Amino acid sequence: VALLQGLTYPEYSAGRLMQRDLVAVPAFWTVGETIDFMRASPDLPDDFYDLFVVDPRHRPVGTVSLSRVLRNRRAVRIDDIMSVDLSPLPVSMDQEELARVFRQQDLVSAPVVDDDGRLVGVVTVDDVVDVIDEEAEDDLMKMGGVLEDDLYRAAFATARSRSTWLAVNICTAFLAATVISLFEATIEAVVALAVLMPIVASMGGNAATQTLTVAVRALATRELSASNAMRIVWKETVVGMFNGVAFAILVGLVAFAWFQDVLIGLVIAAAMVVNLVVAGFVGVVIPVVLDRLKIDPAIAASIFVTMVTDVVGFLAFLGLGTLVLL
């Protein structure tokens, strides 16, 4: 019966995750009555951390930890030792949101209530640890554009599921190639630019991926929101500038030593700063925008971020090369 009831709740919801075996007692009971009840009850859960205090309509009004019950005298009333700092979870709450609540409030367990606010189950930290592992794995799979069961699916089905974002990626790659084609004459005149181009694109892509990973994770945990988005965008842009200047000096010196041309060193150094600043900026802005559009940034953001850093990197490097070297 419990299994059938659980299947009536949405998949990946608190209703599916919760345990129905719990200890609920009225507020007017004493510690002694509560202990006697637990000793006599054949349906207690094997392991539990908290007792839930309910009103006559079976709505949770407080909690008491098992250790606190055992430390108090038998005559003490439950409502005198209970905590009213409750975090009831709706049965329909998504398990990712549920895990965020546990993480933010350092909960050990939390009551689950139905639409009428009545206690129907409990979620414990043991269950939430599994959810956090599942969600982290799911986000990792999405960022790679693959599915969890790809290892066991037929080759054609796997290829079809991966083809969508590969098709989007090839369109963005052609856009980057179009930018390069605008500077054919420059590349023909200064072959060193063709040699150094991958460095600019690679550094921008890696810097953007670092920022993107932080932003996607912060969005998933609700640490990145409208209230602090501008501050995080500014911070990551400044980080990009610092790294850009540091690596610009390094790459500029290497390019100068390689080609014996100061101007080539200056061009790639300037392009490096521009691309890493842009990488820091778009690494936050793009996932935030996708999240606002209800598109999962873990799936789509990396493609668009890579496109921007490639286009900006090539445009800055080859554009500066055209202005300075020709």
Language-model features: where?
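Cytosolic regulatory modules rich in charged/polar residues
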Residues: V1-V195
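Alpha-helical transmembrane segments and their membrane-interface boundaries
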Residues: I132, A136-F281, V285-V308, A316-L326
